[in-house]
Regions:
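N-terminal low-complexity, Ser/Thr- and acidic-residue-enriched intrinsically disordered segments
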Residues: 1-60
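A general "terminal functional-core" signal
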Residues: 2-9, 15, 69-319
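Generic alpha-helix structural propensity
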Residues: 28, 32, 54, 62-66, ...
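Short amphipathic alpha-helical segments with coiled-coil-like heptad repeat character
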Residues: 41-43, 67, 113
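Charged, often glycine-rich, active-site loop that binds/positions anionic groups
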Residues: 52-76
């Protein structure tokens, strides 16, 4: 029997990455997505795959040893915060965050070994964590680890990172700001109106990496029309910048009704972006793309947005 070309990751280890019932990043996000996947009869079309755990050496591809140690210690007593007040410590946070990273790396392995054409992890895309600190509900930055992992393990150098979460992907942008081989495209709510307050249009990279990054901010209340205009700029940018691998951070907090953001997109924006990137992946890098769930704090929106990404990943699939 042929291996199904789209891997989707599922397991209690992923669901354990949450900050409790009273926190926006709560415990139901993982299950809501998988319930919707089954309701739409998509579960039978993908290969449901268990999570994996990252090693300390893998975490250290991006994070400092002192920060890894800090999270490990906080995980033992589960008290306090890992940042200035957004990201609480909890018992087992080190293991839970390591499972997020390990699952993203497993998705890369599945694609690079030819087991999968696309892959999606709902609890991933923790784009605010920096090399030496947590931020914005993000403990370890699986995207940052993934970029180094691709380079060190598969000699994949020219990587495209696309972020359509309502929040700017500061943990990737600033830690790869001078990296000319990290192509970066981010559509987000205007940083003057939303955490982390970054991602201005004139931030295009520094040094040899100038013009390898594109930041496109949307005003509060922006709809699919404004997103489509921004996405056309992303596609134009990518015409001259073919990648070897694509990472899509597809946060669902850009949809109308999210409790902590103010954009008014629909899930059609996620489908459009995912379809476009799949076409680019098929054209330039043998279809290699992973999707990471990112943010999203309205459970209905999570279910709608992420399943649209899966539908896009299933279009014109090849074995």
């Amino acid at each position: 029997m042929k291996t199904k070309p789209v891997f989707v990751y599922k397991g209690d280890a992923l669901a354990k990455y949450n900050f409790g019932d009273n926190h926006p990043f709560g415990p139901k996000r993982h299950h809501v997505f998988h319930d919707e996947l089954e309701r739409l009869s998509l579960g039978a079309l993908v290969q449901i795959t268990p999570p994996s755990r990252a090693s300390i050496d893998q975490l250290a591809l991006f994070h400092t040893s002192s920060y890894i140690d800090q999270v490990s210690r906080a995980s033992e007593d589960g008290k306090g915060f890992l940042d200035d007040g957004d990201t609480p410590a909890f018992l087992g946070v080190f293991e839970a965050a390591s499972d997020v990273v390990g699952t993203t790396l497993a998705a890369i392995d599945a694609i690079m070994h030819g087991q999968a054409r696309r892959a999606f992890s709902p609890i991933g895309g923790l784009h605010h964590a920096r090399r030496d600190k947590a931020g914005g509900f993000c403990v370890f930055n699986d995207c940052g680890v993934a970029i180094h992992y691709l380079r060190e393990n598969y000699n994949v150098q020219r990587i495209l990172y696309v972020d359509i979460d309502a929040h700017h992907g500061d943990g990737i942008f600033y830690d790869f700001e001078d990296d000319a081989d990290l192509l970066f495209a981010d559509i987000h709510q205007d940083g003057d109106t939303l955490y982390p307050g970054t991602g201005a249009s004139d931030e295009t990279g520094i040094g040899n990496a100038v013009n390898t990054k594109i930041n496109l901010s949307l005003p509060p209340g922006a709809t699919d029309n404004e997103f489509s205009e921004a996405w056309a700029k992303v596609e134009n940018y990518l015409m001259d910048n073919p990648p070897e691998f694509i990472i899509l951070q597809c946060g669902a907090d850009s949809l109308a009704g999210d409790p902590i953001t103010q954009l008014n997109l629909t899930e059609a924006a996620h489908r459009m972006a995912a379809l476009s990137l799949c076409q680019i992946a098929d054209r330039h890098c043998d279809g290699r793309i992973i999707g990471l769930g990112g943010g999203g704090y309205n459970l209905d929106n999570i279910a709608k947005a992420w399943t649209q990404v899966i539908k896009a990943f299933l279009v014109n699939q090849k074995s």
